[in-house]
Amino acid sequence: MKNGFKISVVIPANPAEIYEAWLSTRGHTSMTGSAARVSGKVGRRFTAWDGYIFGRTLELEPDQRIVQAWRTSEFPVEAPDSRLEVLLEKVENGTNVTLTHTGLPPDSASSYKQGWKDFYFTPMKDYFGK
């Protein structure tokens, strides 16, 4: 996938718990370990990782799907927002979380893919695994 990627991980929680945490300020901050401001409403802006990540929520399907216009402070000013789709699917030992992240600046996809692993998936496994 040019300027994007798809990645999945199983998190030890049900889809509703992950959905709620992703879309609430307290939950997002707790599951990542870094300050966030998030709303569970379409059209609302969000920030995460102390403002490094920011954007707007575009589509929501409760407990199943989140779509956001997404960027970081490292994006070139003239670059359009990327598109993040989060799919939540119940599996035997938790929820399969699949991220499809497209429209990233050229040559940045591998760095952002690793960032999702290090700064989201690892802390989410720890948080929900308690």
Predicted regions and their residues:
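A conserved amphipathic terminal alpha-helix motif
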Residues: G103-K130
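Hydrophobic beta-strand positions in extracellular immunoglobulin-like domains
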Residues: I11, H101-G103
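Hydrophobic-ligand binding "helix-grip"
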Residues: T29, G33-A36, T47, G51-N96, ...
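Hydrophobic ligand-binding cavity/cleft-lining segments
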Residues: M1-R37
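Alpha-helical scaffold segments that form or flank carboxylate-/histidine-based iron centers
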Residues: K6, A13, R44-W49, S111
